[in-house]
């Protein structure tokens, strides 16, 4: 069932009786973690915010990647559930093999958290992940896991998380696409260079494809829905599907620099990514998404059918003006 909210959202409400939960949110000072916390509080649930560095609103300062089992059990004691809103972003590029870094950032902390959560009796969990696992599931012929270490790490994260949690601790995997919106001191990482570009008067170019998109608030709502349901499902989050050209055009308009977006020929897109892959190879850098295979992503329509279509314009404007 659903209920109409005064803020204009139609929020899902599970049919079973909802009790007041106490939820620990790891990465709660980040963009998505902030909106998960806001939604939990809006619905009357108790929260504990965990982050690596102290700042306003952080209840516990802890690095879960380095915490002991005893520390994690103490952190989780008395909570009904846990949300992991941290991890290594797909855009991070460093020298050396990326696989171990992705495992240490995306897999190991989730396993440690869920092992502790199971021990102390938590009954629900959610992991904020990536919509690339959705596409690997529905389009195995694309070979995303074989081509991209980041996708492999997210698949491993989901699999081992559920194995660790066991049958009495359902784990929802929140599959997050391109996100718009802001939080105090936070914007989407991908948006920084793009917003700088659209704020200039430089010509705008885009491939022919596009992507599912959502607001940070939409991620918060989907995550809390999953927690209230004690869901163990894979949950792709989408409010609107945008072509790249439309996304750039709307961002430019929101930034006060409206202008046309030209379509890049597919051959040019492929050549650019091949060149980028060679440069990374020469410099010894390995990204989470293999650059020479990115053309297949940017030239496709990475669309997801939205269960409740909604414009992301408000969040898009926030992003462009941040």
Each PLM stretch: what is its role?
Residues 49-54:
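N-terminal Rossmann-fold cofactor-binding loop
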Residues 55-58, 62-108:
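NAD(P)H-binding glycine-rich loop region in Rossmannoid oxidoreductase-like domains
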Residues 23-43:
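N-terminal Rossmann NAD(P)H-binding glycine-rich loop of SDR-like oxidoreductase domains
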Residues 108-152:
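Conserved Rossmann-fold NAD(P)-dependent oxidoreductase catalytic core, especially the SDR/UDP-sugar
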Residues 138-238:
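Oxidoreductase cofactor-interface core, primarily capturing Rossmann-like NAD(P)-dependent enzymes
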